[in-house]
């Protein structure tokens, strides 16, 4: 029952804050889909709390940098198509290897940052704030849901004791 309570509370806060994120993204001229990738990175990161927020942020940003390396590197010799493929393979390898460092240990976050950059056509000045604000929304979604679940459980325990 406790697991369902937590899931329901996270679903409620995620639903509310997702709607708010959509409005904020449009109001600020950000990429709403990239923000949802930021949210997803936090939810998917095995570490929670501020540590998970920081690790997710570092990996998302490293992914942005790696994508730019691929894009700029491939553009150096656009007539040599194979260069882009080789560069992508080498960079993907490095994206995984960097996970030996704690702050870069969430490999999916690195790939999410890279994918957002590719989808955003390399416009990192738009992609980075979209990912970052989305990441903060993801943190708020999950942690406000956990707070709501704890508060609800505490209220139920007080009610059960008083009966």
Segments predicted by a language model, with ranges:
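Pore- and pathway-forming membrane helices of multi-pass small-molecule/ion transporters and channels
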Residues: 30-47, 89-123
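Amphipathic alpha-helical interaction elements
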Residues: 45-46, 62, 78
